[in-house]
C-alpha cells in the first residue's frame, strides 16, 4: 500500500491505515504530499520499482495524486508515450491541471 494522504487531510487516519495493511500482511509506505516535488516523486518511483512491494495499491483522497504519479511511472519506468499515459492517468482520476503540469514537466526533465 502506498498512501499519498497527509495526516492533516480530512478523514485521513494514517495510523489506522498502516495497522490495517500490516494486519493482513501488506507493506505500508506513506509518502505524504499536497504539492508534488522531485523528492516525493523519486521516493514513489523507487517504491513502485521495488518488486518486493508488489502487487501495490496506491491511494490518496481523490485519485488526482495517484493519477499524476502513475503518469510519471508509466512514462519514466514503463516507456509509455505521454498521450497514452495521460489517458490512463485521467481514467484513474487525474483532473488537476496543476498536477498535470507538474507530471508533464517531470517527465520532460532528463
Describe the function of each predicted region.
Residues 5-10, 32-36, 74-76:
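Short histidine/acidic/glycine/proline-rich micro-motifs that form metal-
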Residues 24-56:
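Helix-loop module immediately N-terminal to the HCX5R catalytic loop
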Residues 2-5, 48, 52, 73, ...:
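Sec/Tat-exported extracytoplasmic proteins
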Residues 67-82:
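Active-site-adjacent alpha-helix immediately C-terminal to a catalytic or transition-state-stabilizing loop
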Residues 13, 17, 40, 44, ...:
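Stable alpha-helical elements in mature extracytoplasmic
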Residues 56-67:
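A phosphate-binding catalytic loop at a beta-strand-loop-alpha-helix junction
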Residues 79-110:
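Cysteine-dependent PTP/DSP-like catalytic domain, specifically the C-terminal lobe
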Amino acid at each position: 500500500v502506498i498512501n499519498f494522504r497527509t495526516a492533516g487531510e480530512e478523514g485521513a487516519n494514517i495510523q489506522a491505515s498502516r495497522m490495517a495493511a500490516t494486519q493482513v500482511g501488506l507493506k505500508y509506505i506513506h509518502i505524504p504530499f499536497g504539492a508534488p516535488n522531485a523528492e516525493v516523486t523519486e521516493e514513489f518511483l523507487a517504491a513502485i520499482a521495488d518488486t518486493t512491494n508488489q502487487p501495490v495499491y496506491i491511494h490518496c483522497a481523490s485519485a488526482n495524486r495517484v493519477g499524476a504519479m502513475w503518469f510519471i511511472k508509466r512514462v519514466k519506468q514503463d516507456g509509455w508515450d505521454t498521450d497514452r499515459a495521460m489517458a490512463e492517468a485521467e481514467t484513474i482520476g487525474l483532473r488537476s491541471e496543476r498536477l498535470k503540469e507538474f507530471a508533464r514537466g517531470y517527465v520532460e526533465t532528463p
